[in-house]
Amino acid sequence: MSKIFVNPSAIRAGLADLEMAEETVDLINRNIEDNDAHLQGEPIEVDNLPEDMKRLHLDDEKSSNLGEMVRVGEGKYREDFQMDEGEDPNLLFQSYLDNVGVQIVRQMRSGERFLKIWSQTVEEIVSYVTVNFPNPPRRSSEDKSTQTTGRELKKETTSAFSQRESQPSKARMVAQVAPGPPALEWSATNEEDDLSVEAEIAHQIAESFSKKYKFPSRSSGIFLYNFEQLKMNLDDIVKEAKNVPGVTRLAHDGSKIPLRCVLGWVALANSKKFQLLVEADKLSKIMQDDLNRYTSC
């Protein structure tokens, strides 16, 4: 009777596929729950109406005063009733942003460029805000306390802005000083820290978000891993990817970035499971080879 031998690496690959399928189902369920989160809020009840509105009564004996009171109410509370009763503009705006986010993900998965999608989305958001949140008329006279508060707020805003400007420079210094994975040579440096670079990195990562990459395992075999298994936001992945030597320069030039190297870098820094599975020395060599191959092109 013949015996059938099964390669251990095939078993490990099958187990990895099953685990990835379970994690994908969990990720889809969490996305569905997050998208429906705004539907679980309690309705807002308006208990206190303006005094002039409380005095409105449908009384035949006071029909002459009714029209006068309505005109007063319209003049005094015109801004309070621009939207339908019971509609909170903040909730509507949050729901609108949720739909915009879902639409962006769909367009990116269909292959559209991120910069084009983002420019169109910004125009739509600005148009929505302009229509539904018009600027209130400025008052001709303000008391001294209001002016003082405005000046203090301006100072706080200026100081906060200066702190935010200093953060990227500090981040670049830390990225240059911090050591990388073992045996990974720092042969390139990050450059051009701007929004266009982040957009290009995000676009390339999003296109390959579900693609599986091979990594060396501690058991002298290989295992498959992708960006979805990180369970991280795309923005956080991009921020971590910018610390990979040479990635920002490649993205600034519009070149392809070494996605397997980026995935290994981010996973090694944020995934304990990945750290337990991967062979660190072999991973460092693979990442260095990928980086050298892409930067030499």
From Swiss-Prot:
Q: What mutagenesis or variant effect is reported for F223L? A: In strain: Isolate PM1503
- Residue span of region DYNLL1 and DYNLL2 binding: 138-172
Q: Give the motif span (Nuclear export signal).
A: 49-58
Which residue windows does the record flag with biased composition (Polar residues)?
A: 158-169
**Magnesium listed as a keyword:** no
Keywords, in A-Z order = Chaperone, Cytoplasmic inwards viral transport, Host cytoplasm, Host nucleus, Host-virus interaction, Inhibition of host innate immune response by virus, Inhibition of host interferon signaling pathway by virus, Inhibition of host STAT1 by virus, Inhibition of host STAT2 by virus, Inhibition of host TBK1 by virus, Inhibition of host TLR pathway by virus, Interferon antiviral system evasion, Microtubular inwards viral transport, Phosphoprotein, Viral immunoevasion, Viral RNA replication, Virion, Virus entry into host cell
- Please tell me whether the keyword Disulfide bond is annotated for this protein: no
Q: Where is this motif: Nuclear localization signal?
A: 211-214
Residues that the record marks as modified (Phosphoserine) are S63, S64, S162, S210, S271
The SS bond pairs are none
By its UniProt entry, which InterPro entries does this protein fall under? PP_M1-like, PP_M1_C, RABV_P-like_C
> What protein does this entry describe?
Phosphoprotein
What organism is listed for this UniProt entry? Answer: Rabies virus (strain PM1503/AVO1) (RABV)
Q: Which GO terms describe its biological process?
A: microtubule-dependent intracellular transport of viral material towards nucleus; symbiont entry into host cell; symbiont-mediated suppression of host cytoplasmic pattern recognition receptor signaling pathway via inhibition of TBK1 activity; symbiont-mediated suppression of host JAK-STAT cascade via inhibition of STAT1 activity; symbiont-mediated suppression of host JAK-STAT cascade via inhibition of STAT2 activity; symbiont-mediated suppression of host toll-like receptor signaling pathway; symbiont-mediated suppression of host type I interferon-mediated signaling pathway; viral transcription
> Which residues lie in Basic and acidic residues bias regions?
139-157
Q: What does changing P179S do?
A: In strain: Isolate PM1503
> Pfam families from the entry?
PP_M1
Q: Domain of life, per the record?
A: Viruses
Q: Which Gene3D superfamilies match?
A: 6.10.140.1560, Phosphoprotein, C-terminal domain
Tell me how the protein is altered or processed after translation.
Phosphorylated by host PKC and by an unknown kinase.
Q: So what family is this one in?
A: Belongs to the lyssavirus protein P family.
In the record, what terms sit under GO molecular function?
Answer: RNA-directed RNA polymerase activity
